[in-house]
């Protein structure tokens, strides 16, 4: 089926030229609210035989490698996310009574097509079930390009989306599930099979952990793979690095660099370290061949200067403690609230927070994505 669809839509794919990059680059043009339409019902779904697979059972079919779904497999769930704020982009989460899943619809302004609480019916035949650092995802075939290594890719073409995603009736927004630390620990221990991943949840009484995590790629021309330490700068294991905003837009990223609060950050990863970003250059790092050429004409500029030149919005993760368990709240640099400062009382530890969002897993750790502005998703106690 997939090969047939690709052949039919090859010309459309060339025209659309939509990127498969994992980094979020929202098109922040105004979009209309969901328009009136005639919703699908179970009786009107094309080819539906009357039986749904639960989201939990679908995810259980993943066995440590991408699986192209075959057969008349349908799931249904209610929409739990919106891309209005820019923090979730080119994907949508749906949830049934058994769990949630990340549906990789490669479009912007999805909130103009899919409303919170709306039921979506998903025909899974021909789609690919995979994981990104342990997080279940349902999308198109694996993206194994020179710069990316992902088990699924975005469903970019509307014609393909229309064959797989059917809009059902509107409904009330899903109420977040109030979870305990024990439930979160159990999901972490279960890895990919954790019951909380992809679900809309609330954790209560989270304390700020005074630590962040960020990973920057100074040269957009080089791969973003772990095997390219010359193109990696980590901010981790050293407090907050002067970051007091939820993330950083392009302007915020430049501002932090220019203030010098990241000067001691090193280029490299693991055991391979090239030196501080404010002193080392691609040439002095000993880079050679095409790798060095990719920095031309800035091979003798410091990495800090190169990072400012190639600046873009970037993710930041802030650590919180939920009991004794670490939870990262990860925010896109393209979110409308990227440069909003965390409340000083939260940072100081004077107050805790009840946080609502989509719970995910990343490399064995719990990670939160806010689905609304912090003023809505983060309530101080």
Regions inferred by a protein language model and the residue ranges of each:
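Sec-dependent signal peptide hydrophobic core
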Residues: 5-10
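OB-fold nucleic-acid-binding modules
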Residues: 18-89, 93-119, 123-381
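C-terminal motif of bacterial Sec signal peptides marking the signal peptidase cleavage site
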Residues: 13-16
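Positively charged n-region of N-terminal signal peptides that target proteins for export
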Residues: 1-4, 18
């Amino acid at each position: 089926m997939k090969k047939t669809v690709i052949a039919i839509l090859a010309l459309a794919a060339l025209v659309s030229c939509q990127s498969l990059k994992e980094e979020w680059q929202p098109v922040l043009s105004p979009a209309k609210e969901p328009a009136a339409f005639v919703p699908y019902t179970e009786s009107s779904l094309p080819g539906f035989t009357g039986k749904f697979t639960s989201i939990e059972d679908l995810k259980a079919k993943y066995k440590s490698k991408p699986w192209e779904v075959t057969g008349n497999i349908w799931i249904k769930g209610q929409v739990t996310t919106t891309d209005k704020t820019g923090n979730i982009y080119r994907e949508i989460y749906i949830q049934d009574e058994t769990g949630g899943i990340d549906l990789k619809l490669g479009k912007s302004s999805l909130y103009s097509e899919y409303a919170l609480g709306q039921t979506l019916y998903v025909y899974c035949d021909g789609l690919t079930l995979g994981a990104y650092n342990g997080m279940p995802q349902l999308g198109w075939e694996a993206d194994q390009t020179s710069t990316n290594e992902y088990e699924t890719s975005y469903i970019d073409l509307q014609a393909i989306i229309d064959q797989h995603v059917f809009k059902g009736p509107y409904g009330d927004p899903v109420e977040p599930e109030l979870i305990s630390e024990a439930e979160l620990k159990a999901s972490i221990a279960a890895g990919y099979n954790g019951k909380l991943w992809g679900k809309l949840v609330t954790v209560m009484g989270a304390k700020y952990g005074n630590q962040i995590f960020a990973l920057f790629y100074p040269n957009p021309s080089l791969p973003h793979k772990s095997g390219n330490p010359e193109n990696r700068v980590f901010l981790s294991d050293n407090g907050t690095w002067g970051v007091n905003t939820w993330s950083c837009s392009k302007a915020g990223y430049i501002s932090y660099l220019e203030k010098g609060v990241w000067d001691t950050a090193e280029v490299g990863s693991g055991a391979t370290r090239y030196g501080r970003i404010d002193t080392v250059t691609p040439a002095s790092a000993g880079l050679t061949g095409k790798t060095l050429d990719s920095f031309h004409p800035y091979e003798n500029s410091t990495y800090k200067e190169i990072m400012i030149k190639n600046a873009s919005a970037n993710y930041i993760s802030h650590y919180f403690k939920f009991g004794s368990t670490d939870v990262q709240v990860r925010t896109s640099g393209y979110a409308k609230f990227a440069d909003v400062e965390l409340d000083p009382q939260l940072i100081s530890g004077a107050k805790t927070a009840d946080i609502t969002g989509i719970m995910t897993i990343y490399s064995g750790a719990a990670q939160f994505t806010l689905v609304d502005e912090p003023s809505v998703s983060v309530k101080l106690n």
